[in-house]
Amino acid sequence: MKKRLLVAEDEHDLLVIYRMMLGDAYEVIEAQNGREAVEMWNQFHPDLVLMDIQMPVMSGDAAIREILGVDPLAKILAVTAYRYSAEQLGVPVLNKGFGPSEFVAAVESMLHGHAAGSNHPAAC
């Protein structure tokens, strides 16, 4: 059974690129803002959320707080072009500018219970 990923990203081109990098290995659900991400998370309970931070309607950091407020064990990887720390967001961070192998490795690492990204909180 494929792992289910929720990809929250407001830039359509990046959604297409992420889908290409992930290939057919995962079931991918998309959200284009933080509010949609929370709704999709509540509906589908994905194995991992890949969350952009700067999005319309509701920011990714607000969506992260809302999801973790319901399920503190939810697996979320912040994917951002901005310099946020894992301590600020409460989840591991993968800074945009990564290559396909780094992206897939971060996803696999998170799915297997390890912190991923360029910096991560000690709790992960």
Regions found by a protein language model. Give the residues of each.
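Conserved acidic carboxylate
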Residues: E9
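Active-site residues of response regulator receiver
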Residues: D52
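Two-component/phosphorelay signaling modules centered on CheY-like receiver
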Residues: H12-I29
